[in-house]
């Protein structure tokens, strides 16, 4: 069971948006006492496909812009995302394992090296994704606030249903935070989001598969620790950000990436503006599968990453302090890049698909008369059309779904060097 209060949608269907309280959202919530079992998840939310999304672009969000006229998301249309003809592949059941050696091979089980320049005892492992599955899904429409969105809650419904129907996820192992829920613990406040992030990675073991999905406003703020080449941190905006502030990529990396052991998978989907490096993952790939960032040895230099070999001894939290001591005088450019590579790599298997690069906005879309995020729709639809895809094939498929109507270019990033020709499993 999830062990998280307020997980999911209160059982019997979603409730209407809450009446505005404290500016359209609930005041900061008191701390949880003991984690409790969530209510049963009985409502099955439908998911959708067929028409391509209409071009409804929202530009980079200015929190001071005027609130649009409220637009409800309405009842779900009758169309569905259809089930794929074959089940989603696993490491043991896939086209390659069944004799088609032209298909993408499953991930290897042996430890993998980061490459020249990294300590010999510092390795990562691909997850086999056959352990426990947990998911955290966040959708924020910002009801009654400036910059209100229409499709983010629908994104969460669609994604949660897709995970349950096509992967090994269970409702009781999901936490869903949306701003249409009456339970204060299920509101996407900053406190609830941070607590849920800790819940997601708690007690994760090798070959577990964790899933994080965020649909809402994203933006940029001035970088304060010198780890961003462009001088800006990427941020997400909780529903109560005007009172308690945003959440930075540094904080999300510290909570959800740094504690993970080798062989734990975290798959993250960000459907927000300026989200290309929202988890601060140092390896970034193009649609051709080419590493867009220089490799570890070129930037960091041989021996520079010696301190992070403490990962292999289990000292996951002492790593950053050691490395930051080496780089404390670095300010930008190549030095900032080297610091990012030194502190943001991980022996875990963290993969992120984002709706846009750091300098791009993302789009709201309309699909079968339902508002939804373009990236969330494209991810589901691409896998529905072809479950047996490599990472680079999936990235290309997502871009193919978007390119006819949108300028945004989704991006693939990873915590370790990624063989993009391997089978995508989750």
From Swiss-Prot:
Presence of keyword Nucleus: no
Please give the GO cellular component terms listed in this UniProt entry. Answer: cytoplasm
Q: List the EC numbers from the record.
A: 3.4.22.-
Q: Where is the composition biased (Low complexity)?
A: 21-68
Major enzyme class: hydrolase
Gly residues bias spans: 1-14
Q: Which Pfam families match?
A: Peptidase_C14
InterPro entries for this protein: Caspase-like_dom_sf, Metacaspase, Pept_C14_caspase
Record-annotated active site: 217, 273
Write down the Gene3D superfamilies for this protein, in alphabetical order: 3.40.50.12660
Q: Which SUPFAM superfamilies match?
A: Caspase-like
Q: Which family does it belong to?
A: Belongs to the peptidase C14B family.
Q: What task does this protein carry out?
A: Involved in cell death (apoptosis).
Name of the protein in its database record: Metacaspase-1B
Q: What is the lineage of its organism?
A: Eukaryota, Fungi, Dikarya, Ascomycota, Pezizomycotina
Name the gene that codes for it. Answer: casB
């Amino acid at each position: 069971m999830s062990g998280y209060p307020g997980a999911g949608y209160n059982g019997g269907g979603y409730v209407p948006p809450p009446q505005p309280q404290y500016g359209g959202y609930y005041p900061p919530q008191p701390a949880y006492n003991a984690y409790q079992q969530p209510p049963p998840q009985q409502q099955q939310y439908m998911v959708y496909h067929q028409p391509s999304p209409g071009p409804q672009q929202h530009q980079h969000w200015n929190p001071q812009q005027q609130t649009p006229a409220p637009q409800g998301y309405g009842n779900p249309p009758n169309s569905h995302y259809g089930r794929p003809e074959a089940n989603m592949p696993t490491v043991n059941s896939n086209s390659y394992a069944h004799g088609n050696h032209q298909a993408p091979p499953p991930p290897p089980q042996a430890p993998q090296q980061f490459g020249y320049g990294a300590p010999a005892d510092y390795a990562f492992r691909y997850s086999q994704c056959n352990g426990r599955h947990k998911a955290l899904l966040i959708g924020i429409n910002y009801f009654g606030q400036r910059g209100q969105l229409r499709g983010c809650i629908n994104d969460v419904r669609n994604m949660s249903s897709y995970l349950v129907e096509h992967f090994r996820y269970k409702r009781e192992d999901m936490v869903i935070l949306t701003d249409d829920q009456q339970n204060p613990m299920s509101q996407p406040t900053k406190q609830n989001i941070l607590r849920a992030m800790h819940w997601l990675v708690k007690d994760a073991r090798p070959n577990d598969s964790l899933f994080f999905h965020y649909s809402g406003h994203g933006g940029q703020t001035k970088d304060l620790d010198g780890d961003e080449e462009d001088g800006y941190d990427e941020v997400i905006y909780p529903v109560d950000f005007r009172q308690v502030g945003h959440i930075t990529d540094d904080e999300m990396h510290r909570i959800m990436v740094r504690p993970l052991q080798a062989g734990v998978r975290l798959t993250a989907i960000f459907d927000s503006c300026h989200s290309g490096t929202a988890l601060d993952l140092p390896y970034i790939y193009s649609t051709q599968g080419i590493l867009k960032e220089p490799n570890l040895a070129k930037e960091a230099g041989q021996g520079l990453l010696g301190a992070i070999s403490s990962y292999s001894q289990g000292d996951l939290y002492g790593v950053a302090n050691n490395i930051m001591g080496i780089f404390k005088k670095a300010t930008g450019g190549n030095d900032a890049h080297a610091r990012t590579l030194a502190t943001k790599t991980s022996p875990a298997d963290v993969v992120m698909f984002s709706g846009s690069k750091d300098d791009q906005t993302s789009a709201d879309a309309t699909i079968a008369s339902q508002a939804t995020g373009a990236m969330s729709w494209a991810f589901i639809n691409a896998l529905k059309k072809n479950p047996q895809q490599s990472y680079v094939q999936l990235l290309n498929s997502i871009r193919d779904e978007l390119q006819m109507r949108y300028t945004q270019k989704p991006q693939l990033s990873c915590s370790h060097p990624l063989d993009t020709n391997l089978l995508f499993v989750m």
